[in-house]
């Protein structure tokens, strides 16, 4: 369980409540969640972030009317800088996008600029938006995380409660390595509704070798944990830094879509490329 799931800052969210749908443009539908809610308990301060990164969103259900009344459709890609004051609550994002459905825009650029302006205002941070025609995406192959998958270890799991102390199981004389580890067993739950969130996570680091059994147990322990996607990734980054102090660390998670949106946060303390390739479950 999160220590802040009843915080006053969350009380006004539409998430988990019956909500009418609007098909006329309304930027006020967007709702922010302060990043400080999970960062403060982790000791992460906005003036000295231990990482850089972004939340990459894919917008699959985006439509509007052109100036002749003909519906237009696109797939959108948003990159929200991790230095923003707020993350964007996903149900409100879905409702906001739905408000474009019967709204007329003069051009694709007008749609893109409107999205970028509204989302940056809500998040209080830098946002980039790209819109793709469906023909630009046809035939694209499924992607995969590079790295060694740790999921096939022959271990016994008896607890599914979050426990960062699994990472305390490390070798004092472990050699320094640089490697990339991958797990597809990340599952957490929405902070508010407790609906399941399914994801894959890639961890690239340089430092003392991470105990792979300990890491897998740690990842599986998120199974009953209630936090938003972005918060889980920052918790993973913070916990690995706390227990292993790697020289370099990058954590990238890609979650399955819900409500026409998928969220793919990454955090890193080094140069890192986060390709937005769709994984098999996405």
Swiss-Prot record:
It catalyses: 7-aminomethyl-7-carbaguanine + 2 NADP(+) = 7-cyano-7-deazaguanine + 2 NADPH + 3 H(+). GO terms for biological process: queuosine biosynthetic process; tRNA modification. Its EC number is 1.7.1.13. Gene3D superfamilies: 3.30.1130.10. Substrate binds at residues 88-90, 229-230. The keyword Oxidoreductase applies. Pathway: tRNA modification; tRNA-queuosine biosynthesis. It is found in: Cytoplasm. HAMAP family: QueF_type2. Catalyzes the NADPH-dependent reduction of 7-cyano-7-deazaguanine (preQ0) to 7-aminomethyl-7-deazaguanine (preQ1). NCBIfam families: QueF. This is NADPH-dependent 7-cyano-7-deazaguanine reductase. The gene is queF.
């Amino acid at each position: 369980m999160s220590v802040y799931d009843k915080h006053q800052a969350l009380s006004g969210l539409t998430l988990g409540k019956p909500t009418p749908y609007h098909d006329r443009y309304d930027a006020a539908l967007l709702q922010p969640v302060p990043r400080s809610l999970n960062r403060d308990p982790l000791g992460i301060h906005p003036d000295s972030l231990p990482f850089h990164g972004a939340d990459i969103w894919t917008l699959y259900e985006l439509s509007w009317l052109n100036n002749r009344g003909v519906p237009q459709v696109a797939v959108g890609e948003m990159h929200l800088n991790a230095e923003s004051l707020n993350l964007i609550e996903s149900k409100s994002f879905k409702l906001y996008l739905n408000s474009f459905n019967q709204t007329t825009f003069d051009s694709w650029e007008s749609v893109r600029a409107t999205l970028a302006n509204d989302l940056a205002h809500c998040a209080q941070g830098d946002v980039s938006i790209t819109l793709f025609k469906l023909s630009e995406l046809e035939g694209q192959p499924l992607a995969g995380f590079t790295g060694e998958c740790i999921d096939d270890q022959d271990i016994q799991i008896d607890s599914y409660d979050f426990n960062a102390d699994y990472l305390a199981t490390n070798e004092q004389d472990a050699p320094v390595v640089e490697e990339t580890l991958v797990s597809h067993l990340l599952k957490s739950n929405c902070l508010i509704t407790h609906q399941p969130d399914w994801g894959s996570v890639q961890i690239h680091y340089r430092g003392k070798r991470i105990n792979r059994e300990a890491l897998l147990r740690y990842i599986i322990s998120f199974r009953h944990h209630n936090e938003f996607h972005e918060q889980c990734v920052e918790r993973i980054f913070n916990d690995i830094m706390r227990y292993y102090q790697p020289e370099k660390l990058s954590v990238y998670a890609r979650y399955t879509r819900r409500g026409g949106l998928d969220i793919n946060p990454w955090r890193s303390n080094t140069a890192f490329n986060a390709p937005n390739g769709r994984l098999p479950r996405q």
